[in-house]
Structure formats: C-alpha cells, structure tokens
Regions:
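P-loop NTPase catalytic phosphate-binding loop
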Residues: 1-159, 234-343, 347-414
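Charged, amphipathic alpha-helical linker segments immediately N-terminal to NTP-binding catalytic cores
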Residues: 1, 209-237
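Feature targets compositionally biased, intrinsically disordered low-complexity regions
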Residues: 179-181, 186, 231, 236-237, ...
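Generic structural signal of hydrophobic/aromatic residues within well-ordered alpha-helices
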Residues: 61, 115, 200-207, 219, ...
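Conserved P-loop NTPase
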Residues: 160-220, 422-425
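Intrinsically disordered, low-complexity acidic/polar segments
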Residues: 13, 199-201, 223, 262
Length: 425
C-alpha cells in the first residue's frame, strides 16, 4: 500500500507524467483519500485545474473551497491570493493547494506565469503554516529549480521521454502504457487507485452532516456604495473606494499619508464612478475640514454632489480656468511667510479653513493653461491643505506625464490607481 505522508519532507508533493498517464486521476485520488478520512473542519482544498477538467467533480466535496478551470483566470489568481493569506495568518485547519497542469504556469511566457512566484513562496513557507502544495506536471523541466528543489516528495507516472526521469531512467522505459502506473520516490513500481464520480458521491454522503469549508471569496460583479459601507471598516483616516487585495479587504485613500490621488484607465473603465465614490467619502468629512472644487467637463457628476461641500463646480473650459484661478488665490494666502517657525510649520496652524480637494475628471479635456496656475502651489500642497484628485484616460498618458502639470503631480508621488489600459501606454 502506497501512503504519502504530508507531514514529512516539507509537506508538498510533485507528480510528473506524460500525456494520458493518469496525472489528473492521481490528484482526484489524493484529494478524495484525504477527504474521506478527515472532516472539513480539519482540512480544505483549493484546486487549480489547468488539465482536462477532470478535477471539476471535486467541487462537490464539502472540503473543497473552490475549483478554478483554465478559462477562469481571475478565480485562479484569487485562489493563489487566498492560500497565500494563510501563510501570513496560519490556521489550525490544514490547507492543500492542488495544481493540475503546471506547464501552464512554470515556464517562461506561460499563460499563468505571473502566479509562479507566489506559488513558489507558498511552497517555501507553507510547511510552518499547515499549507501543502500538490503539483502535477507533464515534464520535470517545466518546474524551475527554485520550486522543484523545495519539493522532496515526488512520484513519476509514465513519462513521454524516459530520459527525463529524475528517479530511474531504466525503470521508466519498462513501465507499461497504462494510466496510474509509475515509480515511487524509492524507484518501486506503483499503481495509483482510480477515483470515480461515484466514489466522490460516497464521500459527500459520509460527510453529509459536516460543516463545509469556507468557500473561496470572489470580487462581486457590482459593488454599490451601500455594499462597500457594509463590507467593513476602512483603515483609520481613509476614504473607502473599493475592495481588493489578497484579503478582499476595504481599500481606502488616506489624504494625510498620500495627499494626492491619480486614476488612469481606458474609456469606460469606471474612472468617473471611482471619483464619485471618493467624493462621497470626502463629503462625509466635517464641512470645516474639507471642501470640493470640481472640474467636470463631461458633467458626469452634475446633480450628484453634496452642494454643502462644493466650493466650486466647473463644466466648461472658461469656468474651469476661472475657478482654478480663484482657488489658487485662496491657497496663496496660506503660503508660509518668512516668520513661520518650524513648530508652526509642523502644526500647520498659521491659517484656518478647510482642506481644498481639487477634483479633475477627464483631465485630458482640461487645457494645460487652465491647470497651469496650480503648478507653483503643488510643492507646498501639504502646508496649505491642497489635494489633487485626478482621473485621465490612458490614451496619450505617456506624453501627458512629461507635460508641466502632470510632471509636477508625478514628482509628489501620488496614490495611483491603474484601471484597464492599453499595455503600450
């Protein structure tokens, strides 16, 4: 009887086999065997199925948090992010990351090469966090030494080329062409058990009364302001605008830490919705602490703003230029004079009034002449309570970033959000 001990030799397993050698079937058996003898409270599985889809049936098991196929790129990356989270915050429950089709991840220019480094980190640190990785690949050469050397447990099914064997080339040549036949780490012949859909159904019946493992968290298709507010508290001092990151936690912009905010993306990607959410957050601040100056050439925010918080609104080139000049006049009065002490500069108490948030939507439609008066004030923005919140289309951004205004904003290292955009830009 062949037994794989995931509490020895680093806790991970690599399985290699050629076409039709039974790699996917082996993974089904490993998951099913572990699930049969363990409760969902004790063990859970995340499955990345880049093979022929034979692992999809595992999703029926109460132990399985999620199964992602090759066409589900976002779900695949969410699985990797969620499992990586257990490395940072270990749990008593054991977690298995099952990957079928490593040749779609490991080699250079592979379809999912971007997740290879994260998986390598999981393998490197997983043993101390009750996280195990099981990988099936078509050739050992698809696994870079950085990850292959970390996986001591190895099984070989029949390979396409016996010369590729890491266990025994001569024994590889003698293996019959039958799914499940292979070599153990010690060079002994083996036959892996076959797991049918009926077997999986039996395991489901055995654990019918068990509490299922928590399911994989995914981003919603639509996030309303109400859903965002109910999602969870934003970091202290932050203005919430979405959810994301490895933990799908509330994302927020902190104007005190990063006074300026820039969003870039293709047309229709949601930049204006993003600005609307940021302005809703600003509007929740006390009126004596914040006021909005809104440049809105497309009138996307007309009638949606809290008028008590709006100091100025401009929807044309001429009005934009006029309101920016008026704003600059107000802010110039806050510039520190020669008699300001270091203590006053740190406390910012030589002037009184709200911080001014200049919000520019579709900045590509606003002329450089209109924005030019702000340039001289940008280096003093922290001292005078000036915040720039800008959205611009990605087309032509390469040139725009070297223009006077955007160059000055870029030098201040603003918080930056990149939406869908042309890679060449």
């Amino acid at each position: 009887q062949l037994v794989i001990d995931f509490h020895q030799h680093g806790g991970h397993l690599a399985l290699c086999g050629g076409p039709q050698s039974g790699k996917s079937g082996a993974l089904r058996t490993i998951v099913s065997s572990l699930a049969l003898n363990r409760r969902p409270e004790d063990i859970r599985f995340y499955v990345i199925d880049l093979g022929g889809g034979q692992l999809a049936a595992l999703d029926r098991l109460p132990h399985v948090a999620g199964v992602a196929g090759r066409e589900e790129g976002e779900k695949i990356r969410r699985i990797v992010d969620e499992v990586a989270g257990f490395i940072r915050r270990p749990e008593s429950r054991e977690t298995f990351l099952i990957i079928d089709g490593w040749h779609h991840i490991g080699p250079s220019n592979a379809e999912f090469e971007d997740i290879a480094e994260s998986i390598t980190d999981i393998v490197a640190d997983g043993a101390s966090a009750n996280v195990h990785v099981v990988i099936a690949t078509s050739r050992w050469t698809t696994m870079r030494p950085a990850i292959r050397d970390l996986i001591a447990n190895r099984l070989e099914l029949r390979l396409g080329e016996a010369l590729d064997s890491l266990i025994d080339r001569k024994l590889q040549q003698k293996l019959p062409s039958a799914p499940g036949r292979g070599l153990t780490q010690a060079g002994e012949n083996m036959l892996l058990a076959h797991t049918s859909n009926q077997d999986i159904a039996h395991i489901c019946r055995v654990h019918a009364n068990a509490v299922p493992a928590p399911q994989l968290k995914m981003l919603p298709a639509v996030l309303t302001p109400e859903a965002l507010a109910a999602h969870g508290e934003a970091p202290t001092g932050g203005i919430p605008w979405g959810i994301g990151g490895r933990d799908l936690s509330t994302l927020a912009w902190n104007p005190e830490r990063e006074p300026h905010l820039v969003a870039i993306g293709a047309q229709g990607c949601g930049k204006s919705n993003f600005l609307a959410q940021v302005m809703r957050g600003i509007s929740r601040l006390p009126r004596e602490a914040a006021r909005l100056v809104v440049i809105d050439q497309r009138r996307a925010h007309l009638g949606t703003l809290d008028q008590d918080m709006v100091a100025a609104y401009a929807a044309t080139q001429s009005s934009a230029q006029e309101e920016i000049v008026n704003t600059v006049r107000t802010l110039e009065q806050r510039l520190p004079g020669p008699d300001i002490t270091p203590e006053q500069l740190a406390a910012r108490d030589w002037w009184a009034g709200p911080d001014i948030y200049v919000v520019v939507d579709d900045a590509d439609l606003v002329s450089d002449i209109a924005l030019a008066p702000l340039i001289d004030l940008l280096p003093h923005a922290r001292d005078i309570g000036l915040h720039m919140v800008i959205a611009r289309k990605s087309g032509g951004i390469g040139r725009a970033l070297f223009g006077q205004f955007f160059s000055a904003v870029r030098d201040l290292q603003p918080a930056f959000l990149l939406f869908d955009a042309d890679r060449d830009e």
